[in-house]
């Protein structure tokens, strides 16, 4: 049985996470010296071209100065403003060799993301996250407002390190997308961006000839609020004829989708529609799971709840109609409840009218139930 989740790729436009001002200057300088004058001017300059000129001048004259890392970051920032992405990466690589700097790594990552460069994005995402986590991983609470600001800044930089992998993955070829998402999973298995890329990632695994890894990956990713991975895991277990797991994953997916916080940049209406689609699909898997167990009462309830939101997915809709036909027939027959049996007939007939794997059997079932009802 194939996966029926292809129609559930819910990808909103990526929303760039905000990042606060750069980290503080961890050095002291004398503004009366030639190098101090450049540093002072660089700290006050807002024009990208002037910042680039000042940064290049300083690094050419004072490459071993204790402020060289900070200056390199200012130079990278100016080059970013000029969209000189290759030069940003060149400066960053040289600066990194002389000592890791969080701002320098962050600006290099922004350049790599702007280029959609897979290898550079992976490299600088890892370096950016490592530098940020040296600050966020401290056991000591912030001593003052400045330390709190630095901590918040580091958290946002670390978040951007995940965002960079995510946004480049969305534009990558299947093998590269798989590589980038695998890197993101390793970097943070609970990343807020994994639900956004989950279905695209599972499809990319198949396109890359690694479809056999999709179900294990979904089970691994089905944590926290990742409703998309939970639904894929439910689908895997449905195809594997494991009803208990189908119902369990579906319930978790419904809970995750219902309680997920709204993303920035998404309208209330769009967010409500996306959540409804996820919950509706979760209801579908709950219903088919109960049908597998021949628990037709709960199946009937879940599948009816699913219908309005899965109508756009013809494959799921036809199966839901078929299982509703079966549930209502089986609920009505032992009681001699012809009204409920006719309800089952109606669902079988609707399913029979839809092209797909259920069509022939739905048509046969409809004829049998109709005959049992006396042809009317």
Question: Where do the PLM segments sit?
Answer:
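"A position-specific structural signal for the A-helix of alpha-solenoid helical repeats
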Residues: 40, 74, 107, 163-167, ...
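TPR/TPR-like (Sel1-like) alpha-helical repeat modules
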Residues: 97, 113-137, 223, 238, ...
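Structural motif corresponding to the intra-repeat A-B loop/turn of tetratricopeptide repeats
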Residues: 45, 82, 115-116, 171, ...
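N-terminal leader/linker segments that initiate helical-solenoid repeat arrays
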Residues: 18-74, 83-86, 90, 98, ...
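Short solvent-exposed coil/turn linkers within tandem alpha-helical repeat scaffolds
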Residues: 61-69, 97-104, 133-144, 151-156, ...
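Terminal, low-structured helical/coil segments at or just beyond the last alpha-helical repeat
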Residues: 25-30, 277-282, 330, 335-376
